[in-house]
Amino acid sequence: MTKLREDIRNVAIIAHVDHGKTTLVDELLKQSHTLDERKELDERAMDSNDLEKERGITILAKNTAVAYNGTRINIMDTPGHADFGGEVERIMKMVDGVVLVVDAYEGTMPQTRFVLKKALEQNLTPIVVVNKIDKPSARPEEVVDEVLELFIELGADDDQLEFPVVYASAINGTSSLSDNPADQEHTMAPIFDTIIDHIPAPVDNSDEPLQFQVSLLDYNDFVGRIGIGRIFRGTVKVGDQVTLSKLDGTTKNFRVTKLFGFFGLERREIEEAKAGDLIAISGMEDIFVGETITPTDAVEPLPVLRIDEPTLQMTFLANNSPFAGREGKHVTSRKVEERLLAELQTDVSLRVDLGGRRIIKKVSGRGELHLSILIETMRREGYELQVSRPEVIIKEIDGVKCEPFERVQIDTPEEYQGSIIQALSERKGDMLDMQMVGNGQTRLIFLVPARGLIGFSTEFLSMTRGYGIMNHTFDQYLPVVAGEIGGGHRGALVSIDTGKATTYSIMRIEERGTIFVNPGTEVYEGMIVGENARENDLGVNITTAKQMTNVRSATKDQTAVIKTPRILTLEESLEFLDDDEYMEVTPESIRLRKQILNKAERDKANKRKKKAAEAE
C-alpha cells in the first residue's frame, strides 16, 4: 500500500487577473496565524514587487506555507496573465491540486480557461472558490454552472467534474459552503478543511533515491543562483554530494551548500527535506529550470519541463538620441546587454538574441505586457534604452508559415458591439461566440491574429468610452493571414527643430492633431510631439516663440488657452510606434522618435524603400 505524507498538502491558487487570488492568500496567511500578529499585514503581501503592487497583478509565482490543525499547506500563488504563463505551467508540476478562484459576478474568463487547462492536463484535483460573494451583482449559481461547462469543454475527467465549491469574500475574511451571502462565517476554515479533505497528500517515498526538479529560479548575491522545486522522491541533506542532469543531457556534480524551506512569507534555512516538500537548493551556479537533481550513484532525470515559446519580439538598443545620457545611470550598450542577460537568469519565457553587431538585441517574450514590464523594470533601475515596435514571431510548422492567434473576450455595453465587430473584422478576427450577460452587456469572443491586436487596446478604450473590458490570451499558431491587417495607423507630428515647446507653437499646431507634450518640454529634431489627424507624418516647429513688437495689438489682453496634452503611458507609447520609430526610455521620460532624425535623410530613405517595394 502506498504510504502518504498526511502532514502536507501542495496546492496552487489559480484565477483570472483581479479575481481576488492574492487577497485570498493574504487572508489565509492571516487566519492561520502564520504571520506575526505584531507585523501589520501588508495588503497583497504576496505581491512583493513594486510593479505588482502598482498594477494590481501578480507577475512572478510565489510560494508560501501555512499551518492548519497540524497540516502544512504549501500554497503557490501563480500569475493570472497569459504573458506569464511560463510560470503557471511549471508550478502545476509542483502541486497535487488547485484552488480555482472565480469572481461571483464576472464568472469564467479567458485566463481562467488558460490556467485551468494547464491544471487539468496535469491531472490535478480542483477545488472552486467563488469569491466576492458579498457583491450586490453576485450570481453564484450561474457562475458555478459556467465553471462546470468550462470543465466539460476542457475535457475534465469524472473525478475532476465532482469538484467541491466554497463561497467566500476574501476581502472581508469570510467563507461558507452555502451560496447564500447571509450564511458567510467570519473564518476561512471551510476553505482550509476543503483543501485537507479533497487535495491528495503527496506520496511518501523518502527511502528511495532522490529526485528533485527545478521549477523556478531565484538569485541571491550571497549564495548565487537558487533552484526552487519539489522533491518527487527521496531525501536531501545539506552537504550531500549530488548530480545535476542538464537540459542538453550532460551532468554536473556539486555539493548542496544550503537548503531553504518556506514558512509563511519567509524562506528559512533547513538541514534536510524529503519527498513531497517544496524547497529551494543552492550550491550550483549553472542550474536551470526543468533540470533534475539526483544522487551521484543513481542518476535518473525526470522528463524535461516544456516551456511555451515566445510569441512577440522587439529590438532593444542603447539610447543614441540627442538627449542620451542626461537622465540615466546605465547608458552604454554593454550595460543594457548585461541587464538583459541577467534577466535570463530568472525569466525562462524570455529569449535574448545578441545579433552579430551586438549593438542591437532582439528580445522575445510572451506578449506586450511581458516585455513592457521588463522595460519598466529596467527604467526604474536607472537604464536608458530604445526599443522598436513589437512584432510577432512567425514559425514554420510542417513547411507552412504560421503566426500566433489570440482568443479575445470582450464585455461591452450593447451599443458598442457593432463598431467592435467591424474593427476586429478589419484586423482579420473571426467571431466565435456572442452572448448577452445581463445589465445590457454583451460578451463577444474572437480568434484574432496577434499582430492584429498590437495597438488595438487604446482604440478599443476610446471606441467603448472606457466601458468595455477586453482580455486576450494566446490560443494557437495558425497559417499566416494574407494581406495587410487593418487598423489604420495615423501619422505623427514630428518636431523639425531642437528647443523647448512653446504655448504659442502648440496653439498653432494643435488643430492638426493631438499633442503629446506640455509647454516647456525639451524636444529635439525627429522627436514625435503628437499624433497627426491624417495618415501621413507632418513636420512641425513646436519651439517658435511669439515675436515681440512694440505695437499694441487689439488682442493683446487675450490669454493663450491650449488643450491638455495627451501624455502617453509606456504601453500606449509601444502601441503608437510605427516600423520606422523608436521609443526612448529613461528613468524620467518616455519619448517617441523617428529612427532617422533628420527630415531630408528620412525622406530619402522612404523613397528608397518605396522603390525597393515597387521592384518586388
Locations of regions flagged by a protein language model:
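Structural and coupling elements of P-loop NTPases
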Residues: 1-616
